[in-house]
């Protein structure tokens, strides 16, 4: 669980900072949220599988 939270935090920071550094005109949280959504769409199957594994471990 800590790994998921850490990964999400890193992706959020990267998605917000990179557009600002690269000087995009619409840089900032709005532009970053679009990038983050794209990343999450690609990650979703892996994330769902991980959450499923965690759930089965908890349930026994």
Curated annotation (Swiss-Prot):
One of its GO terms (molecular function) is toxin activity. This is Myrmicitoxin(1)-Pr4a. Its main location: secreted. Residues 1-23 form the signal peptide. Coiled coil: none annotated. One of its GO terms (cellular component) is extracellular region. Toxin that causes a rapid and irreversible paralysis when intrathoracically injected into insects (blowflies). Does not cause spontaneous nocifensive behaviors by intraplantar injection in mice. The keyword Secreted applies. The lineage of its organism: Eukaryota, Metazoa, Ecdysozoa, Arthropoda, Hexapoda. Expressed by the venom gland. The modification Glutamine amide is found at residue 59. Keywords: Amidation, Neurotoxin, Secreted, Signal, Toxin.
């Amino acid at each position: 669980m800590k790994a998921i939270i850490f990964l999400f935090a890193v992706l959020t920071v990267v998605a917000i900072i990179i557009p600002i550094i690269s000087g995009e005109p619409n840089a900032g949280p709005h532009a970053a949220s679009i990038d983050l959504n794209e990343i999450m769409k690609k990650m979703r199957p892996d994330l769902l599988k991980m959450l499923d594994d965690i759930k089965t471990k908890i349930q026994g």
